[in-house]
Every structure is written in C-alpha cells, then in structure tokens.
Amino acid sequence: MSTLQTLWRSDPAVARIIDGEMRRQRDGLELIASENYASRAVMEAQGSALTNKYAEGYPGARYYGGCEWVDQVEDLARERVKELFGAAYANVQPHSGSQANMAVYFTFLRPGDKVLGMNLAHGGHLTHGSPVNFSGQLYTFVAYGIDPKTERIDYEQVAEIAHRERPKMITVGASAYSRAIDYAVFRQIADDVGAFLFADIAHPAGLIAKGLLPSPIKYAHVVTSTTHKTLRGPRGGIILMGEDFENPFGLKAAKSGRTLMMSELLDKMVIPGVQGGPLMHVIAAKAVGFGENLQPEFETYARQVIRNAQTLANALIARGYHVLSGGTDNHLMLIDLRNKAVSGKAAQEALDRAAITTNKNAVPNDDKSPLITSGIRLGTPALTTRGMKEPEMEQIAALIDDVITHINDDHVINRVREEVMALCARFPVPGLEPST
C-alpha cells in the first residue's frame, strides 16, 4: 500500500475510487489533448497544509491575518510565470481557464458588447461565444472560422467580419485547432477596427512558453491560459499582460484621482469581482509547475510533444484518415471520421474499451449533434510525459485504426487492449504508482 495509506484506513470507499482512476491512468493510453500527468511534486504541493488557509486579497493586502507564507508562494508563482512568458503582469488566482476568461470579459466589456471569436464547430471554445455559455449569453458574439479548402484560419475572413461588425474585442484561441496562429495579423486587424485583442492560449501554452509556437504576449492586450494541458501543472487558470497600460475607460482612483492601470482592474475583477478566496494549495502547485516549465528539460519535452503529434497525424493520414488541415503544428489534431462511416461517439466508446482514451469532437459543418459528433480529437502531451516517442506513435496509430476498422469486433478490441496495457507497462507514468 504505497500511496493513499491514510485514506484506505479512513474512507476505503473514496480510496477505492481514486485507486481505480490511478489504475486507469496507469494502464491506458491518454490521448485527450487537454489532459496530462502532473508531477509528484505538483501533487504534493496541492495536497499540502496550504489547503487550510484562507487568503482573500493579494500579497501584502489580505483581508485575513497569518498570510506571511502564502504571500511568499503567490509572489513566487507570479514571478515564475512572468519569467516563463516574458510578461509584465500576472494573476495566478483564477480557479480555471473559464474563470480567467470571465474576469477578462468583465474587465474589458459591458453586457451586450460585440465580440469576434472562433466558431466552436471550427475549433473554438465554449467561452468564446457559445450560446450555452455565459460568454454567448452576456455578449453579442459573431464568429470567424476556417477556410473550407485549407481548413486553416481564414485571416481575410476575420478582417472582413471585423470591419463589418466593428467588435469591441477579438478573442483568439481554440480548443481543437492544430495550426500555429498569427497573432501579429490578429493585432493588426484589432487595431484597424479599434478592438481589444484577447488571446486564450490554454491549449498550446507550454509550447508557446518554450518558443516553439508564436507568442501573443507582445501582441494581445491580455492573455489567459490554464496551467495543466501542455504546461503539465495543476488544474487552474492565469491572466497575463505583456505590458500594463492605463485603462481607456476613464476610471480613476478614488482618493488620488490618478488613472487606474489595467492590472488593477483585472486584479479587482478576479477578487472580489468573480471569485472570493484563492486556492492557495493550487497556487503553490502552480508555482512548482512553473518552476518545472523553466527548466531546460521542459523544452526537450515540449519539442517531443510536437514531434509525436506530427508523427501520429501523419501515420493516421497514411491509413486514410482525414486529419483537418492535413497535419498539426502543435500537440493536437482533429480527425473527421465521416469518410470512415463512424461517429465520434462510437469511436470514443470503442477506443475506451481498448483502453485508449479520446474525446468525441464536432468538426466543421458537422451534421451530428454535439453528443454524437463526426470526429475525435487526439493529443500527445500525456503520452510524451510517459516517455513515448515516434515509434510508439506509429504503433498507437495502428492500434487506433484497428479499433475503428473493427469497431464491433470484441476480439480485435480485446487484443488491442492487451497491446495497450503491454505498451503502458513499458512506459510507466512518472510518480503514479498503484496503491495496492
């Protein structure tokens, strides 16, 4: 009983569930693009005594006493992430990427303001204007998408829509787009129409941080990210700015009358605007994760993530799969399964039975519901954390093809599952041992 020892004694029901999830992660291939394996150090920080501490406010300006240690860890997290991205400002308190985005929208916009964001069906995100999300309910979103031929962002269309609609903000970022984004072009479009540029880099953040993809830091007025995914830290959010600037809304400090900086408005919007007490144990884990990201070996990891994704995409293309845009520049790919006559839901469920975890995903012009979809999204961050490289990607492509080609054949799926478990045994998850 190497882990969860106290939990097995005090609450075996919960211990059993956690142990089952640990075994699932250990014994299966994780290809969900937004998932990764946090280090043991990150998890130790997140499970520390900082869980017990309330710390509303910011370092040096808390509403509670006894914050001398949590002040230090929040300062450390902020300094590390600023160094990582070359940012002048960082807020590490958002509980999630969605709450970071909410704080940005609430700071820069008013209800009903017009925003230009990427179509969810073309690779965008719920918080970029989906009508079922607060963003689409509070603001007037118009969508840009990908070119139907190249399956890449159509920058001419973006400019055309922006000039026609005159949005107050342009949101750039995606959850299922496999190509590098030209933030300089987006900034030029934003400047041409007098819009703020907001970049959500939740998915490629780790690759951007190591200079392997273009960075929006010097182009966007504000940037958000999650801290897991390609950053491989705890689940959480951050807000960044490449440079601070005076707010353009005429807001003044109550006593001095000076113009408030945007950093001050963002800080006030995070707390008390959209959150209360920060999760100090998670902020400590963020600090640990950022420290790991700053090490030279993380660049080696990030480069391998991209090489693995490109190898996997090419191997699937060679087997007749429609990978959108014909490949990938980052950690993920979107597979349109319509030429295989298989739905995303059916593929996901069959792959689950083979211990290959993916997620169904809508594709452009999808005629199926979001609960069914015509595609799946694949990513390589977690596989790369296990130490897998190009040869394993070739093998995994063959296993995926076996399952989808024989989607109703339990014999094939069981054989693939055995191969998956053997492969996983060769590449254990760092720091994740079974508890019994």
Swiss-Prot record:
Task: State one molecular function term (GO).
Answer: glycine hydroxymethyltransferase activity
Q: Which Gene3D superfamilies does the entry mention? A: Aspartate Aminotransferase, domain 1, Type I PLP-dependent aspartate aminotransferase-like (Major domain)
The pathway noted for it is: One-carbon metabolism; tetrahydrofolate interconversion; Amino-acid biosynthesis; glycine biosynthesis; glycine from L-serine: step 1/1
Entry GO CC: cytosol
Q: What EC number(s) is this enzyme filed under?
A: 2.1.2.1
- What functional role does this protein have? Catalyzes the reversible interconversion of serine and glycine with tetrahydrofolate (THF) serving as the one-carbon carrier. This reaction serves as the major source of one-carbon groups required for the biosynthesis of purines, thymidylate, methionine, and other important biomolecules. Also exhibits THF-independent aldolase activity toward beta-hydroxyamino acids, producing glycine and aldehydes, via a retro-aldol mechanism.
The molecule here is called: Serine hydroxymethyltransferase
Q: Which organism is it from?
A: Roseiflexus sp. (strain RS-1)
Taxonomic lineage is: Bacteria, Bacillati, Chloroflexota, Chloroflexia, Chloroflexales
